Structures are given as structure tokens and as C-alpha cells.
Amino acid sequence: MNQGLLHSKILSFASHIPDNFVSIDEFAAVGDLPGKLDLHRLTGIEGHRKSDAEEGSLELAIKAAEKSMTRADIKPEEIDLVINCAVSNLSGKLGLHISPSMATIIAKELGIEEAICFDISN
């Protein structure tokens, strides 16, 4: 048994959402919904975040990983495990992405070379 595993811990995690805010009224205007439907009152949702065309879940995940590394004050060579948890595998650069795992691409982008990488998705 690897004794190092007994001392493993999560030092940090993070998320990143796009800066662009779209109100629920703007969002609903694109769809085929009745104009008098008050979605904010019905749902309590004020709006959604919208990424740019070049910014998919991969790019958002890379930004989140950078935040996490900064918070923990950790260098790429100190990271042993990269887990990407996402509902979608979309990349502004790649479009729909299936293989290799997004965690592998995130690790490569951040200079993490000696880590186990895997995705968790629905």
C-alpha cells in the first residue's frame, strides 16, 4: 500500500462562470414563449450567464483550475490528481469533445505533467 495515499487531501477547488449576464426576459425573448409570461416571478430566476463563442466548458474549467491553484498557492508539479466535474464537454476551440478526458486537457494547459486525470459527468 502506498503510504502517501494516507495523507492525500483536497487543498482547493473552484468554479468559474462567464461574465456576460443575460436577463431572464432577454433569454425568454429568443424562445417561443408568450410575451406576457413573467418568468422571473414564476421561477425566481433573474438571469443566466452566457459564455462567448470561444469559451466553452473546457475554457471555463481551465479558468477555475487556475483560481484553485492560486487559492492553494500550489505549483503544477505539486498536483497529483485532476478531476473535472462537468455536465457538458464543450470547448470553444474543439466544439463537442469526447476523448481524451477534459481533465487531461486541463492538466496539459496548466503544465501539470505527473497527475492522474479523469472526468466525472452525468
Enumerate the predicted regions with their spans.
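Conserved active-site "lid/cap" helical segment
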Residues: 1-83
